[in-house]
């Protein structure tokens, strides 16, 4: 009787796992974007942005490299990502470009000026990767890269 209970419990667990796996797999495989974008990689290289220092940066200078675009904020719970981004920059800078766009769009977590942001990033995280001026990343005024 004891073995019967153990075997029944084992098969019950397998059936529950199988049902859960099937549900998750089928649900995820059916997810499709609900928007259509006219954006393509060629149009990316036609964009530009103003660096945190005030210089115009043409994105065509990034051709031939992988580009990681990330919105950042100094008072965000993910602020320590600057360490990871700087690590990636140092390790892969010959083939990876990191573009940091400070944004105050989410919970007002980037209240400082561009000067404050640059000082914070350099003094606390030694950021050397490309940073841009504070930018909207959502809404009508968002930068075209977003």
Describe the function of each predicted region.
Residues 51, 71-75:
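Amphipathic alpha-helical repeat scaffolds
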